From Swiss-Prot:
It catalyses: uridine(34) in tRNA + AH2 + O2 = 5-hydroxyuridine(34) in tRNA + A + H2O. It is an enzyme of class 1 (oxidoreductase). This is tRNA uridine(34) hydroxylase. PROSITE patterns: RHODANESE_3. The active site is at C185 (cysteine persulfide intermediate). GO terms for molecular function: oxidoreductase activity, acting on paired donors, with incorporation or reduction of molecular oxygen. It holds the Pfam family UPF0176_N. InterPro entries: Rhodanese-like_dom, Rhodanese-like_dom_sf, Rhodanese_C, TrhO, TRHO_N. It comes from the Bacteria. Residues 130-225 form the Rhodanese domain. Its EC number is 1.14.-.-. Keywords: Oxidoreductase, tRNA processing. GO terms for biological process: tRNA modification.
Amino acid sequence: MSMPKIVLFYVFTPLADPEAIRLWQKALAEKWNLKGRVIISKDGINATLGGELNDVKRYCRETRSYAPFKNADIKWSEGEGDDFPRLSVKVRPELVTFGAGDELKVNEEGVIGGGTHLKPEDLHHLMDERGDDVVFFDGRNAMEAEIGKFRNAVVPNTTTTRDFLNEIESGKYDDLKKRPVVTYCTGGIRCEVLSVLMKNRGFEEVYQLDGGIVRYGEAYGNDGYWDGSLYVFDKRMHMEFGSGTESLGHCVECGKPTAQFVNCANNDCRKLFLRCDECTAAHKHQYCGECEPALV
């Protein structure tokens, strides 16, 4: 019986020879028939891979056998069997492209000078103690927050992670600099970097959600501070943490609640936008709001 799984993990640690790690990871993923994306830099590894359960287990076991990766927090979720079109293993200057690689410092323990890590239960303790003074700060692209976010979260106007520096330097969030700010993202990696950038720019009390939305959803499902669906970077495109999840997103055609993104049919655009299955089925073409007036 087929049991497809998806794993997500990252490790910040100094790597003396990223290219050697790339070759090893590529061979390892190919050996176990995995597809997905692995990014390696001098600061560590960031991976999202899918395959059959036993193959993924073997890959994880061998990856953790390398001492710098032995404590990798590997997050598991259900796959569909064809979640990624191919395998990509690359070396890049940054694990997450904020455009601020010179600000990030890592050692064998991880990122130096980042926000205080909060496990899901620690976040609830903070909320009990500080209440409305706590600010959730979304560390993802704004599009991802259209279908799910922490309650009353601040969602910066970002299309890519490169936009965050301009956002936090714009002055529009200066009123948050003396408040407890909890950064969050899908699995935690973006907030490892974002929290450093925010602290370097005068945010005095910065936290990061340990394990990201994934670990929080596993712990509290729909019974905590998370609302809606989680955008994911594979064929599923979204996942939920329990039955009865109410989507925050709405179809651009009919306004019906939906968590389903589709790509604009204009090959020069390919922008993702929300469209329910019924409206997609009823239209031969699917263009985003910017392209439709010009092409339809």
